[in-house]
Amino acid sequence: MMKKFVAAGVLAVSSMLASQWGMAATLEYDMRTLAIGYKTFSGSDNAQQATAALTKMRAAALDSKKQAPAKVQKDPQQLKAYYAGVDQLVGEIDKTNALVKAGKLAQAKQEGKKLLDIRDTNHKKFR
């Protein structure tokens, strides 16, 4: 009886830890996807490549809203600010992508530099 109780407790704790680890890995993956996407976008020499990179970045940014950093999850104000930062990033990605689609790749790359500013600002707040 005692062995079953201990085994159940270990299983429950393991499940909780695995769940938290899985969420962190997903958020880390989204952030890595954003970084790789930006590098691809900034080095692109055609609209198709730039649009593909920005599209992947947008999807990763939206996915990152599904799981906030652990320290942010505990504070409703911080969580609201985190979501606002992600929304700002998505808005800037959309603005940059609109320039690419309008055939203004050079201007889009200049506008896209704001993505780094948004990243840096939000990393200071939430990392």
Feature-to-residue mapping (PLM):
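N-terminal signal peptide c-region/cleavage motif recognized by signal peptidases
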Residues: L17-S19
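Mature extracytoplasmic or organellar-lumen-exposed domains after removal of signal/transit peptides
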Residues: A24-R127
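Enrichment for repetitive, rod-forming helical segments
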Residues: V10-L11, F126
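Bacterial N-terminal signal peptides that target proteins for export
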Residues: M1-V10
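Cleavable N-terminal signal peptides
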Residues: L11-A12, G22
